[in-house]
């Protein structure tokens, strides 16, 4: 992850490198959206295009996924036409099933459990603006998919993450336990509280979110 973020920052800031780097040339990347999307859809389409590929957007009403065709059948069919698939879905089990049955790479563009590309983009922004982060990353909001991957990505990069969630809206404990285990290797800590004031005290970065998911 650190290498990907540093590479992305260099690509963003080096116009000559960006103009000449076309690893997706001749490839078509399909993006399936069960949920409406603004930033995710635009960023994937622009990104694939800039890297030389052809983006193909498939909305839920455009295909038979989950209707007359199963996720596994859809994965097999799309793999014959596409060089990669991104999938923004409701159930995390569906993106796992798609990945298991596809013969091309599959990227989770959002599920109810994870939002990895969002976390990578957030950590990239933090690295760009606070490379010498003095203090922990603070989260105030519900324990949703974005927090799950902020916990994982934050400790991978060696940052302590302290989060405040309302009682009964805590993150998935398996994800928290996984982040704690990763933190033991990187020296980063996960700290939980229900008090937002405590969470933001002495923070280097404060990340807030709504209590009702936008999807």
Located regions from the model:
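Positively charged, low-complexity intrinsically disordered leader regions
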Residues: 1-42, 46, 114
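Glycine-rich phosphate/diphosphate-binding loop of Rossmann-like nucleotide-binding domains
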Residues: 34-46, 129-208, 214
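A short, aliphatic-rich alpha-helical micro-motif
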Residues: 79, 99, 199-201
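Short, acidic/turn-prone active-site loops that include or flank metal/cofactor-
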Residues: 61-63, 110-115, 166-169
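Short glycine-rich, flexible loops that bind phosphorylated cofactors or substrates
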Residues: 93-94, 213-215
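Active-site cofactor/substrate anionic-group-binding motifs, chiefly glycine-
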Residues: 28-81
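Anion-binding alpha/beta catalytic cores of soluble intermediary-metabolism enzymes, centered on
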Residues: 75-76, 83-153
């Amino acid at each position: 992850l650190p290498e990907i973020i540093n590479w992305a920052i260099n690509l963003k800031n080096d116009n000559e490198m960006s103009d000449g780097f076309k690893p997706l040339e001749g490839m078509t990347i399909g993006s399936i959206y069960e949920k409406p999307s603004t930033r995710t859809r635009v960023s994937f389409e622009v990104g694939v295009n800039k890297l030389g590929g052809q983006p193909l957007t498939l909305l839920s009403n455009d295909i038979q996924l989950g209707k007359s065709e199963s996720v596994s059948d859809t994965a097999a069919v799309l793999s014959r036409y596409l060089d990669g698939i991104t999938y923004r879905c409701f159930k995390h089990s569906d993106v796992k099933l798609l990945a298991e049955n596809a013969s091309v790479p599959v990227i989770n563009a959002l599920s109810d459990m994870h939002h990895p590309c969002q976390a990578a983009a957030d950590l990239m922004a933090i690295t760009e603006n606070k490379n010498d982060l003095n203090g922990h990353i603070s989260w105030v909001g519900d324990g949703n998919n974005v927090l799950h991957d902020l916990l994982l990505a934050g400790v991978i990069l060696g940052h302590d993450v302290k989060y405040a969630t309302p009682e009964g809206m805590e993150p998935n404990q398996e994800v928290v336990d996984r982040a704690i285990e990763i933190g033991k290797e990187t020296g980063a800590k996960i700290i939980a509280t229900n008090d937002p004031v405590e969470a933001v005290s002495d923070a280097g970065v404060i990340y807030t979110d709504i209590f009702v998911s936008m999807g």
